[in-house]
Amino acid sequence: MSLMIYSVLVAFVVSLIQGPILIPLLHKFKFGQNIRSEGPESHKKKSGTPTMGGVIFIISSVITVFVVSRHPSFETKLAIFAFVAFGIIGLIDDSLKIIHKENEGLKAYQKMILLLIVSSIIGFYAYNNPRIGSEIIVPFVHKTWNLGMFYIPFIIFYFAATTNAVNLTDGLDGLATSITLLVMTFFAVVSYATGNYNLAVFCSIVAGALLGFLKYNAYPAQVFMGDTGSLALGGVVGAVAMMLKLPLIVIIVGGIYLAEALSVILQVGSFKLRGKRIFKMSPIHHHFELSGWHETKIVSIFSIITVILCLIGFLSLIKMNGFSL
């Protein structure tokens, strides 16, 4: 437990130190965010805010891993791979947006191909590692499903879902950062309670790095995480849950991610089928914005909801074998 606390503090400080160094550099090289014209009017003033800020918490996390552990475990290495690999895809996407001076980087099929490649690599290594295998645990009922040959296709779909859902959540200052900070704290506790101490330390590191990044990303944001950050966070949330054999619990603790993704699916589906919109704008955080809610109120309420969902997540695991709080 003391190593977890130490890891949080180190990652937090490293993240804080990087802000004053990297943010001016992003300004200098004009790595500013292009705001989509169809977005909320209040977001227009954010145009030019530096993006790619996800590199702050990615670098902080990687540095801290090697500060606190000279020989990272297999689980830590796989989590770092997911974190960095998905982050690189986001970095490419962000770079193209800046080069083209538009809010469109990689084409949808290009991004999906890259996501599928990384997801396949992770799924293959997880499937062939005896400590992970092809089993997943079902929350509440505590039954184990062995997916066998369907495990890798499931993991590919799963990572496509988590990365895109977190990406959609990153639409307000501090929103994706706050939600994922809470989710990673949840996984740190679960990892510790199940004896996965290396993973517990890694989750603590990411949580600490996000806490430091929040100083620069909270309203009014000095920097956006960009796709660099949101895809990396979707990847690391997915990887940690996968290694705990708890990918299904993301549906519970990541309920905000799910709501954001579903709101887009429902909005698009309704408009194509009925010619009518369900929400004023999607993802759903924009609906609340256009309903008169301030960004900070939305972030606060969504964070409170996530705390409640994490408590429900703990309840769903209480009687699981090997789980002890």
UniProtKB/Swiss-Prot annotation:
UniProt topology in membrane: Multi-pass membrane protein
Reactions catalysed: UDP-N-acetyl-alpha-D-muramoyl-L-alanyl-gamma-D-glutamyl-meso-2,6-diaminopimeloyl-D-alanyl-D-alanine + di-trans,octa-cis-undecaprenyl phosphate = di-trans,octa-cis-undecaprenyl diphospho-N-acetyl-alpha-D-muramoyl-L-alanyl-D-glutamyl-meso-2,6-diaminopimeloyl-D-alanyl-D-alanine + UMP
A GO-annotated cellular component: plasma membrane
Pathway: Cell wall biogenesis; peptidoglycan biosynthesis
Cofactor names: Mg(2+)
Compartments where found: Cell membrane
UniProt entry tagged with the keyword Repeat: no
Enzyme Commission no: 2.7.8.13
Transmembrane intervals: 3-23, 48-68, 79-99, 106-126, 136-156, 174-194, 199-219, 223-243, 246-266, 298-318
Record-level GO BP terms: cell division; cell wall organization; peptidoglycan biosynthetic process; regulation of cell shape
UniProt KW Metal-binding keyword: yes
GO molecular function: metal ion binding; phospho-N-acetylmuramoyl-pentapeptide-transferase activity; UDP-N-acetylmuramoyl-L-alanyl-D-glutamyl-meso-2,6-diaminopimelyl-D-alanyl-D-alanine:undecaprenyl-phosphate transferase activity
Pfam family, one: Glycos_transf_4
Keywords: Cell cycle, Cell division, Cell membrane, Cell shape, Cell wall biogenesis/degradation, Magnesium, Membrane, Metal-binding, Peptidoglycan synthesis, Transferase, Transmembrane, Transmembrane helix
PANTHER family linked: PHOSPHO-N-ACETYLMURAMOYL-PENTAPEPTIDE-TRANSFERASE, PHOSPHO-N-ACETYLMURAMOYL-PENTAPEPTIDE-TRANSFERASE HOMOLOG
UniProt cross-references to NCBIfam families, sorted A to Z: mraY
Family according to the record: Belongs to the glycosyltransferase 4 family. MraY subfamily.
Role noted for this protein: Catalyzes the initial step of the lipid cycle reactions in the biosynthesis of the cell wall peptidoglycan: transfers peptidoglycan precursor phospho-MurNAc-pentapeptide from UDP-MurNAc-pentapeptide onto the lipid carrier undecaprenyl phosphate, yielding undecaprenyl-pyrophosphoryl-MurNAc-pentapeptide, known as lipid I.
The protein, known as: Phospho-N-acetylmuramoyl-pentapeptide-transferase
Species, as recorded: Clostridium novyi (strain NT)
